[in-house]
């Protein structure tokens, strides 16, 4: 779980190698979502200069607005199971967000968000 959370939310998800989607297979799906939410709920948020910070601010106002739009879209394309709003005041902070969807063609499942939003989908098998 730490590797998924770090990949999805480190650098506020602003890296090309960020995990944007996770697929849970069969009976592990519910446990996967529960564990992801638990781990993302305690990721340290803050200024990038603080050593304990795992999720800092987005790069600029355009990025902030884009990610907030995707968070709003996520409510129509899936179930938002975690949206951290305990972010520092001021700046372009967006907390980790975990969304579950059963729509593999949803925008939140197919577009590059480049922010701290992780989409989780279920698969019956490989």
Question: For each of these PLM feature ranges, what is it?
Answer:
Residues 112-113:
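Short, surface-exposed loop/turn microsegments at beta-strand edges and helix-strand junctions
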